[in-house]
Regions:
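Conserved N-terminal entry element of GNAT/NAT acetyltransferase domains
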Residues: 2-39
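Conserved acyl-donor/pantetheine-binding loop and adjacent beta-alpha core of acyl/acetyltransferases
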Residues: 97-150, 194-219
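Conserved beta-strand-loop-alpha-helix junction that forms the acyl-donor binding cleft
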Residues: 142, 181-189
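Single conserved hydrophobic/aromatic residue that forms the stacking wall/gate
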Residues: 246, 251-256
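Short amphipathic alpha-helix that is part of the acyltransferase structural core
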Residues: 25-70, 80-100
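A conserved mid-domain beta-alpha-beta active-site/ligand-binding segment of alpha/beta enzyme cores
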Residues: 211-245
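Conserved acetyl-CoA-binding loop-helix of GNAT-fold acetyltransferases
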Residues: 151-168
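Conserved GNAT acetyl-CoA-binding A-motif
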Residues: 171-183
């Protein structure tokens, strides 16, 4: 496990966050949304990589390298980085990386070159009918010091600010209809809560057309009969309440 790099000098960050890279102001907390790449903002990219590694290591993940930056961040047609910037604190508060379907390249076998290509098989229907109108999202993070409500309104609204930015993408490009990406659940996550979330999503949002299937199917210790008893309702709203009840920060024990 290598040491994480020191924070990038704020003057270098501000020099790269120029007017043409600004997407919009946030609805709350008076922050700014910027879109950058590793090529046009190398110092910002280093700070993004540092913040990712800090946040992901804290929860049991991370790359183990000084920064979390991979080939998809740095390749010729690199993924773009959407970040929340605090003009007041002069800090990056959070971010996503993304690639619009219209910008996706394909390999010699016709397989889309995506950060998730090693995880998923994509059907022809998805590639032809869905992907061109889709934004692939990944590497989402909130800077560790802004993940607690103790950081005040800025911390409370960082996720809201990020969603402002994601929503703005479809305003800039009205052809975008879908958002797609993977969700990471670390081994440290409560397994019972994880199983409930997975069951709930499968119950109400099944992929009947098999648009995307996992290369390595997820194996769980899920007790399906128990899950059925925990989610007895035939509608989303009531089952969602059950899911929240058991998977909130201080969840009830489903065994009781």
């Amino acid at each position: 496990m290598q040491d994480i790099i020191n924070p990038i000098d704020r003057a270098l960050l501000k020099a790269e966050l120029t007017k043409e890279k600004r997407l919009r102001s946030t609805n709350k907390s008076k922050n700014e949304i910027y879109i950058v790449t590793a090529h046009d903002s190398p110092n910002v990219m280093q700070e993004i990589g540092r913040l990712r590694e800090v946040a992901f290591r804290y929860y049991g993940g991370g790359t183990g390298f000084p920064v979390d930056i991979d080939e998809y961040d740095t390749m010729e047609d690199a993924y773009r980085q959407l970040i929340v910037w605090s003009p007041e604190d002069e800090q990056i508060l959070g971010g996503y990386r993304f690639l619009c379907g219209s910008d996706v390249k394909f390999d010699e076998n016709g397989k889309p070159i995506l950060a998730t290509s090693h995880l998923f098989n994509f059907s022809e229907k998805f590639i032809k009918e869905i992907l061109p109108y889709t934004v692939e999202l990944g590497r989402s993070f909130v800077a560790l010091e802004y993940q607690s409500t103790r950081s005040g309104a800025k911390g409370l609204f960082v996720l809201d600010n990020l969603w402002d930015g994601l929503g703005a993408l479809s305003v800039v490009d009205p052809s975008l209809r879908y958002y797609f990406g993977k969700v990471t659940m670390y081994n440290t996550y409560n397994q019972e809560a994880r199983n409930m979330i997975l069951y709930f999503l499968g119950l109400h949002f099944p992929d009947a057309d098999q648009l995307i299937t996992p290369v390595y199917p997820l194996e769980t210790n899920m007790d399906v009969e128990k899950m059925r008893s925990l989610f007895p309702h035939d509608n989303f709203k009531d089952n969602y309440k059950v899911c929240l009840l058991y998977t909130s920060p201080s969840p009830r024990d489903p065994k009781t």
